[in-house]
Amino acid sequence: MQDEIGFDDIKLNYVTIAAARAMGGLRLVLGAYTIPGPWRESCKCLFDVKGIPYISVRCANAGATETSFGADGSHSELLAWTAQSSAPVAIWADERPRSTWIDQLNLAERLAPEPCLVPLDFDVRVHMFGLINEIAGEHGLGWNKRLFLIDQALKSAAPGSADHTFWSVLAEKYLYTAAMGLAAKARIIEILCKLDAELLRSRERGSRYFVGARLSALDIYSACFYALMEPLPPALCPMASSYRPAYRNADPDIEQAMGSALKDHRDFIYREHLRLPVVF
């Protein structure tokens, strides 16, 4: 493996949006880059675990670079197709595009009921969906980690610089305000502590999974979103070297909230159920 991993060191075959629109079957708009965005990785893993084949699709317009992340209208083709401009998006046959985690999970369950990733018990199911929302939903763990990074970056980057422009684009996407940036750290810590407590209760019941005795969607989302705290090592997750520092946590208070249970769980879920090394 190269010491430096580039943004474009991809292995999957990504088709253009125009090509994808003419295809049938399942297409996942992921973006052709080596960044383990937790929403995209969770979406990929749902369909991988169920053995559902899919076509990987670029985010950017034909001829545009993925590094712009939608700036200057470079996601206009995606917007025209899916009525929004972010990845991941799951499109099955001629059905409507699904751009939210819950719609993607429900689609995966419908296309391949087994292995079942949603508990049958009503109370357990409601509990699981609530916890996934705390991880992947708006104002959840991933959302607040982005707000936390945006807040730090905008305070340190020189106005007009490339870094400031990049983070300003993300700030608009995540509805950033100074007040939200200030509150993000406490929210991250709260969610991490709650998830850690959930895992400890599961261990007391003799299970290594969040709910019940088998893999659920919650295990997948927790494992994938832990990358925002501590990515898997390069040999297992060959992400762009320039992005790895931003994914690593450097805050001591958040570090304390991370504990060890969530990391151990992430490693177990990837080792036993998900694709390693991660393929971009």
Language model region names:
Residues 225-276:
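Short His-centered aromatic/hydrophobic patch
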Residues 130, 137-242:
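GST-like fold's C-terminal all-alpha helical module
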